[in-house]
């Protein structure tokens, strides 16, 4: 009887989903927001998080759409390594820049070495999304490079 109760409780635990994105103008924010909403609709406990902006403030402010997006999403918390440890599943969303993830996303991923070394990335269920302003902009290469990192983590990659 106790085992039945425990297994029933386990079945009702919400999946902890971190949706981590970088977006200059808002496209990947919209993708991430939709993924977070879908997770919530399915009963997941969701954290919608952005990675730290590393472009100089003067550059961000010199591009009206970039500045407007930064201001509109100022309320979104920045992702930390602790969010990766917390999550059961992670969806990354980043623009494609010349066939690779943005430097902002890579900078965040590069901070995760200490939690990887402790085994905190093993068996995380992960996926990724990307966008580019042009056809054949390197989206596939971006996703594959992100997945290479995640394979190295020991994560379980779920492709679209």
Name each model feature, range by range.
Residues 122-160:
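Short, glycine-/small-residue-rich phosphate/pyrophosphate-handling segment
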Residues 3-4, 8-117:
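N-terminal beta1-alpha1-beta2 submodule of the flavodoxin-like/Rossmannoid cofactor-binding fold
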């Amino acid at each position: 009887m106790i085992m039945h109760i425990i297994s029933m409780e386990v079945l009702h635990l919400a999946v902890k989903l971190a949706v981590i994105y970088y977006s200059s103008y808002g496209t990947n924010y919209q993708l991430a927001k939709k993924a977070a909403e879908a997770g919530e609709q399915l009963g997941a406990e969701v954290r919608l998080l952005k990675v730290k902006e590393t472009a100089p403030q003067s550059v961000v402010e010199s591009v009206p759409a970039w500045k407007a997006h930064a201001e509109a999403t100022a309320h979104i918390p920045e992702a930390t390594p602790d969010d990766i440890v917390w999550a059961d599943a992670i969806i990354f969303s980043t623009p494609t820049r010349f066939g690779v993830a943005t430097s902002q996303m890579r900078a965040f991923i590069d901070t995760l070495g200490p939690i990887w070394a402790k085994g905190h990335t093993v068996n995380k269920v992960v996926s990724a999304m990307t966008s580019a302003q042009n056809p054949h902009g390197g989206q596939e290469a971006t996703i594959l490079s992100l997945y290479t990192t995640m394979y190295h983590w020991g994560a379980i990659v779920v492709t679209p």
